[in-house]
């Protein structure tokens, strides 16, 4: 490698162009071998740098997302989940609802794929360089309560609640909220109203949600009013995936009497 090569790579590093620094000579040789133009060479190295930056951005977004694992729409079995509205679900994956700050609510019994679809939407958003946050309702309440007790609620709200363009809250209704927790959750929905998209999953119909919000019917109604104003409600029916797997290996669920 000659001194000119060294100078080019040093300049690339100073300009924060690491991908070009490592690959420019390869693209130069490739362009020469294909009788390409200077413009072809410039386009090739800029395309390479852009792709590398996109990949680094996606890796950071994935690390910060809270997604426990990668799920995709392609992994979702519509042949088994016959109660899932396929056309409605597929349309959500164009992610236009995020650009419009609209919400999505997945309703259905345990095991029908609500969390799978919400995680898949989150992953698709990350692949489009959209900042997301996935969290269970229980963990969200724990973090909100801790921030409130420490006098850091405003900071937490700004960073964790308003920061993500898409906030995914899983398992609403599995554990009931106390009065203070219900108020904190209402503030989450109220602050994100028409500012960012929120995805909720719940095993409870809307008519029973107040049971999870300290039986506060008024607060629940106000929360739903904001949540559902610009919202795609996806009702999924069917048998639990997990129950299906147990049956396949010969484990029968116990029936309470």
Labelled PLM ranges:
Residues 1, 5, 14, 28-39, ...:
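Conserved phosphate/pyrophosphate-binding and hydrolysis machinery centered on Walker-type P-loop NTPases
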Residues 1-10, 36, 152, 163, ...:
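Intrinsically disordered, low-complexity and often Lys/Arg-enriched segments
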Residues 11, 17-19, 63-85:
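Dynamic helix-loop-helix/coil hinge segments at AAA+ ATPase domain boundaries and subdomain interfaces
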Residues 17-69:
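Interdomain "pre-motor" coupling segment immediately N-terminal to P-loop NTPase/helicase cores
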Residues 84-162, 212:
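Conserved P-loop
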Residues 103-105, 166, 199:
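Residue-level preference for the first positions of well-ordered beta-strands
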């Amino acid at each position: 490698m000659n001194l000119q090569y060294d100078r080019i790579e040093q300049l690339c590093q100073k300009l924060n162009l690491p991908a070009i620094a490592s690959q420019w000579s390869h693209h130069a040789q490739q362009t020469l071998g294909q009788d390409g133009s200077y413009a072809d060479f410039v386009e090739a190295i800029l395309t390479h740098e852009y792709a590398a930056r996109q990949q680094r951005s996606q890796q950071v977004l994935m690390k910060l997302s809270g997604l426990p694992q990668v799920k995709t729409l392609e992994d979702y079995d519509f042949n088994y989940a016959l109660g899932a509205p396929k056309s409605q679900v597929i349309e959500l994956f164009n992610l236009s609802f995020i650009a419009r700050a609209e919400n999505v609510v997945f309703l259905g019994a345990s095991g029908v794929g609500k969390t799978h679809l919400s995680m898949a939407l989150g992953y698709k958003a990350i692949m489009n360089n959209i900042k997301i946050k996935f969290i269970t309702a229980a963990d969200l309440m724990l973090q909100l309560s801790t921030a409130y007790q420490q006098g850091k609620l405003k900071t937490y709200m700004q960073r964790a609640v308003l920061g993500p363009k898409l906030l995914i809250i899983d398992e609403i209704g599995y554990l009931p909220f106390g009065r203070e927790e219900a108020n904190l959750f209402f503030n989450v929905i109220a602050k994100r109203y028409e500012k960012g998209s929120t995805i909720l999953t719940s095993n409870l119909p809307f008519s029973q949600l107040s049971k999870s919000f300290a039986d506060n019917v008024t607060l629940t109604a106000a929360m739903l009013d904001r949540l559902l104003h610009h919202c795609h409600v996806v009702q999924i029916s069917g048998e639990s995936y997990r129950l299906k797997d147990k049956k396949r290996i010969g484990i029968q669920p116990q029936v309470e009497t």
